[in-house]
């Protein structure tokens, strides 16, 4: 039986048991006292803590650190790199002060006195700040480690500082010479400061101190502003007429030397925005505008047009200050109307653009006449002509199969077209798209390598992103180790002439592979060559491949390398040699001389949209590099860069050009975007020289609008040039001390073939005409080694050829004497003249052989070699 309590139990709480409640109070007090005692014991009694260690080098013992020392980095708020930067910048600023203090005694030009005054005042103030910053942090005002003299000099040079020799030369100069040296050195000095800032900010944890970061930001802005001012001053010292040309869309100032502008054709309707023909970007909305913007397309477009200063976009409204014009959008519009490259065939000129193609009829002495326009957006619109077929490169992701204007926004679409378009132009007034070749990276440029009645072989160069495999089978991007990648290749395309709709890629060779290991990425891997070099693009594409089929050779300008190929088998190009250059950012295009013994490569530093011809831009960056081809190897000879300074509102860098076919010489006409057109003589590949130019002022006075000349080519006696924004220009060369009337006339007689395509060179020949002989003679006359009476002898011989009374024997003896003299001369033009005189005799002999009434015969002794 269970025992039970006769009375129910109640909870034991203080309310019912006062004694228990008191007990709890006593217990709590005792426990609190014990806790206090324990805490005091822990505080007052040393305990063994876990050690904090800083390891030494391998094999060396670790160092034990106190907690306050271990946390010192985060507590300090600055890094060793910050300290080094400030210490170096003090030295850097002091040299700027030293240079500025030279100004007042060496020039009285107020603009220079103002620059020097600003520099001296600002640099002294900044030195004071930097010294205070270091002192407050218990840091030395100078670097504690003193490198060797040679290392220190190199370190200072990398900071943009002038050498001791340069400072001495500056101190000993006066007037304009001083002004030029001062600005050149000071701009480089300021550029060095910007480089130091950029280097520091790349480092993790640097400039964490808000005061230091604000100082660096202000310093960077101030140095860049001063560079812009000095750039204008330095350009003003130039005696080149191209420096300082007034801006304008249709009314820009012009400068020409040994060239004449014959015609300037604006873009036809449908190939420009009538409300904004200059392509000036819209103004950005001001942050102070509180009203909610109307985001409708109509409102946005209307606002854009209202913000333009004029229909041409020549003027600017709303400038905040002299140095800070109103900001404009940096985004690209859906459609671009930029003119690009050209191709010629007979009397047909095809002008490509991002928007399509314009076909013109050209006749000697006449203004080109528009035949028809093909609207087919897709960029960049490079063109070639083969018979009745017109090829067009398309690269943009918004390009459409149907040439539609609406673009494509879907990530994957069957309507997207990127590759090579093929048009039938047998009816020039009604071109028809008859074929397409889709490619993984689109088509930036293309080269017609070979063609006959059956097929056309084309090399395709894609430089854009690799499209997704879901859109085009076989397109693999940058996946490590995957040899199926579309990178590091060119495409070989076959176009059946009678059925261009069956055009296809027949191979995509890996032309950059390591010839020993077979690794696809076998050439330049990208990056800088050394601490002072240009940053060169990775070689995973070719921008241009210029083919010279008759010589079985091609030159590839392939992003990070210049390459020559053997194309004896057009389907399997074989790399012969590859070079790189510390001054090249992006190997862009290539042109052979007529003999195929030289190649001129261009560097498109800045991508064509940046100002790269300012007074302080290096003369071997964004330039041409000229190579001789010796035993199938590229041998560097020289650089050439546009000598005229351009402004920061002018995109300028080396771009497309072609040979001017003057017999006996290597002459090149070239587009430099807003730098204009330059004609150079590189007959002496070690010493290229400019012999002519044409240039306009910038499109806009305060904003960089991408424009200028895309391409300039010689064709049938005239130079045709596509102006990105303004349209098509036609120019001629004029006689000068560099180029005679006979040489220009001989070039006009040159046989370039029936077709001229941008990346396809044909051997040029000249007829056996007296004017060609006189062109050679003019070249020899310029040489100091030419016999004084040679010109008299040649002219006498040419006169004898036209005189029916002269016997064949007289002509034979005269020829023998002349050719003996010419053959003994070590001069290219002498060899050319000797051969031409023989041709003239042979040509006359052939003519006379068909005339039974002519009694003159030529002895066998003068038979041609």
State the predicted function of each range:
Residues 50-238:
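All-alpha RGS (Regulator of G-protein Signaling) helical domain and cognate RGS-like helical scaffolds
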Residues 749-865:
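Soluble extracellular-acting proteins and domains
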Residues 185-188, 192, 199-202, 232, ...:
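Short basic/hydrophobic patches in alpha-helices and adjacent helix-turn junctions
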Residues 1-29:
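N-terminal secretory signal peptides that target proteins for export/translocation
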Residues 239-782, 796:
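Feature marking well-ordered beta-strand scaffolds used for ligand recognition
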Residues 80, 84-87, 177, 184, ...:
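Short, solvent-exposed segments of well-ordered alpha helices
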Residues 86, 93, 100, 116, ...:
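Generic L/I/V-rich hydrophobic alpha-helical segments across diverse proteins
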């Amino acid at each position: 039986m269970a025992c039970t309590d006769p009375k129910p139990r109640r909870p034991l709480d203080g309310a019912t048991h006062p004694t228990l409640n008191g007990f709890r109070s006593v217990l709590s007090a005792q426990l609190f006292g014990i806790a206090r005692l324990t805490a005091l014991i822990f505080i007052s009694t040393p305990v063994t803590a876990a050690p904090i260690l800083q390891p030494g080098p391998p094999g060396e013992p670790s160092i034990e650190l106190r907690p306050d020392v271990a946390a010192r980095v985060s507590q300090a708020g600055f890094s060793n790199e910050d300290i080094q930067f400030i210490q170096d910048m003090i030295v850097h600023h002091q040299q700027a002060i030293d240079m500025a203090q030279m100004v007042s005694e060496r020039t009285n030009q107020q603009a220079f006195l103002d620059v020097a005054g600003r520099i001296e005042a600002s640099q002294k103030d900044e030195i004071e700040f930097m010294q205070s910053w270091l002192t407050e942090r218990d840091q030395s005002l100078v670097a504690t480690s003193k490198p060797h003299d040679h290392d220190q000099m190199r370190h200072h040079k990398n900071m943009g500082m002038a050498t001791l020799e340069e400072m001495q030369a500056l101190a000993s100069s006066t007037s304009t010479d001083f002004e030029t040296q001062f600005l050149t050195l000071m701009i480089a000095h300021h550029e060095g400061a910007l480089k130091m800032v950029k280097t520091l900010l790349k480092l993790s944890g640097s400039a964490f101190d808000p005061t230091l970061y604000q100082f660096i930001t202000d310093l960077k802005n101030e140095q860049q502003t001063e560079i812009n001012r000095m750039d204008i001053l330095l350009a003003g010292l130039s005696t080149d007429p191209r420096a300082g040309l007034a801006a304008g869309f249709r009314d820009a100032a012009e400068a020409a030397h040994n060239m004449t502008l014959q015609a300037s054709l604006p873009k036809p309707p449908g190939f420009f925005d009538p409300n904004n023909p200059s392509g000036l970007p819209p103004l950005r909305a001001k942050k102070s505008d509180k009203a909610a913007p109307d985001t409708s397309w109509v409102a946005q477009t209307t606002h854009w047009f209202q913000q333009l200063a004029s229909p041409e976009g020549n003027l600017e409204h709303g400038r905040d200050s002299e140095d800070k014009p109103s900001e404009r959008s940096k985004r690209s519009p859906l459609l671009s109307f930029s003119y690009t490259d050209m191709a010629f065939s007979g009397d047909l000129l095809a002008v490509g653009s991002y928007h399509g193609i314009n076909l013109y009829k050209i006749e000697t002495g006449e203004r080109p006449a528009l035949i028809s326009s093909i609207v087919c957006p897709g960029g960049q619109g490079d063109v070639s002509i083969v018979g009745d077929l017109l090829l067009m490169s398309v690269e943009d992701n918004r390009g459409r199969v149907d040439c539609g204007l609406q673009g494509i926004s879907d990530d994957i679409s069957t309507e997207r077209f990127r590759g090579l378009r093929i048009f039938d132009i047998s009816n020039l007034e009604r071109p028809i798209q008859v074929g397409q070749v889709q490619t993984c990276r689109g088509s930036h440029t293309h080269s017609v390598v070979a063609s006959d009645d059956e097929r056309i072989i084309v090399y395709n160069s894609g430089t854009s992103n690799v499209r997704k495999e879901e859109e085009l089978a076989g397109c693999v991007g940058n996946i490590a180790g995957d040899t199926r990648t579309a990178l590091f290749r060119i495409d070989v395309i076959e176009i059946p002439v009678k059925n261009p709709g069956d055009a296809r890629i027949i191979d995509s060779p890996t032309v950059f592979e390591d010839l020993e290991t077979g690794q696809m990425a076998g050439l330049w891997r990208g990056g800088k060559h050394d601490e002072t070099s240009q940053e060169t693009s990775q070689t995973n594409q070719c921008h241009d491949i210029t083919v010279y089929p008759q010589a079985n050779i091609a030159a590839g300008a392939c992003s990070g390398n210049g390459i020559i190929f053997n194309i004896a088998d057009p389907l399997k190009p074989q790399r012969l040699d590859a070079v790189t250059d510390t001054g090249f950012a992006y190997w862009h295009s290539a042109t052979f001389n007529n003999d195929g013994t030289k190649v001129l490569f261009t560097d498109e530093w800045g991508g064509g949209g940046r100002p790269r011809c300012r007074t302080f831009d290096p003369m071997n960056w964004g330039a041409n590099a000229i190579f001789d081809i010796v035993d199938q190897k590229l041998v560097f000879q020289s650089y050439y860069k546009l000598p005229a300074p351009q402004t920061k509102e002018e995109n300028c860098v080396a771009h497309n050009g072609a040979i001017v076919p003057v017999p006996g010489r290597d002459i090149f006409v070239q587009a430099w975007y807003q730098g204009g057109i330059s004609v150079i003589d590189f007959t002496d590949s070690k010493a290229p020289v400019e012999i002519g130019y044409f240039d306009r002022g910038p499109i806009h006075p305060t904003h960089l609008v991408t424009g200028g000349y895309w391409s300039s080519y010689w064709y049938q006696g005239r130079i045709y040039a596509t102006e990105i924004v303004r349209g098509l220009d036609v120019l001629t060369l004029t006689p000068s001390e560099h180029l005679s009337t006979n040489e220009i006339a001989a070039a006009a007689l040159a046989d370039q073939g029936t077709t001229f395509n941008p990346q396809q060179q044909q051997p040029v020949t000249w007829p056996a005409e007296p004017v060609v002989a006189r062109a050679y003679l003019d070249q020899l006359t310029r040489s100091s080694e030419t016999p004084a009476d040679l010109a008299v002898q040649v002219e006498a011989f040419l006169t004898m050829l036209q005189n029916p009374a002269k016997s064949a024997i007289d002509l034979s003896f005269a020829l023998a004497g002349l050719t003996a003299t010419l053959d003994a001369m070590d001069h290219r033009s002498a060899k050319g003249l000797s051969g031409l005189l023989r041709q003239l005799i042979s040509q006359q002999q052939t003519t006379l052989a068909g005339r039974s009434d002519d009694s003159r015969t030529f002895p066998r002794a003068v038979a041609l070699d």
